[in-house]
C-alpha cells in the first residue's frame, strides 16, 4: 500500500488516523476481491514523516502505530488478507527503521496475520549486518514478504548487497512467500512521494 502525506496510523491527529484506516480498509477490500492475499508496505505511516519527539511522545506514537495495526489486522482477517509491515530508512520516517523494530511492532500487535516485510534497500541503509537482520526475523518466523532491490535502487546484482547469503537464509529457513523486485529508473521519483 502506498501511504503518502496525510496517511498515518501513528498520527497524533485522530482525523488523520481515521482517514488512513478508511483508506487501508479500502485497500484490504480491493486485495480481497483480487485474491491478492497480502497487503505490504509501511502500513503504520507514510513516507516523509521524520521528526524529533520527546521519549513520551515517541512512546505514544509507537502505541498509536501498534493499536492501528492491531485494528487493521482485525479488518484484514475479514478479507482473508495478511499484513506485511515494512521498515523504512531514517530519511523516510522516524517511526520504525530496522527489521528488529518492525519485528517488535509486529510482536506487540500480536496477530497471526501480521508479519515483517524485509526490504533490502532500506535494510542496506539501516542495518549493521543485513544477514543478521534478516535471520533475526526469519528465526522469529515473521518474514512474510521480501523486496529485492539493490542499494542504489537498481536490480539485484548491481550494488553491494550480499544476494547469495540473503537468498541462502531464505532457503535455509524455508521462506515460501513472494520475492518482489522493487527497482526504480535512474532519476525516477519514488511513487509514494508523489
Enumerate the predicted regions with their spans.
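Hydrophobic residues in well-ordered beta-strands that form the structural core
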Residues: 1-2, 40-41, 85, 118, ...
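N-proximal short alpha-helices
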Residues: 4, 75-78, 136, 153
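Active-site-proximal loop/turn and secondary-structure-junction residues that shape catalytic pockets
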Residues: 4-6, 43-47, 87-91, 120-122, ...
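Generic detector of short alpha-helix boundary/capping microenvironments
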Residues: 8, 90, 165-168
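Histidine-acidic metal/acid-base catalytic patches
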Residues: 35-37, 96-118, 123-194
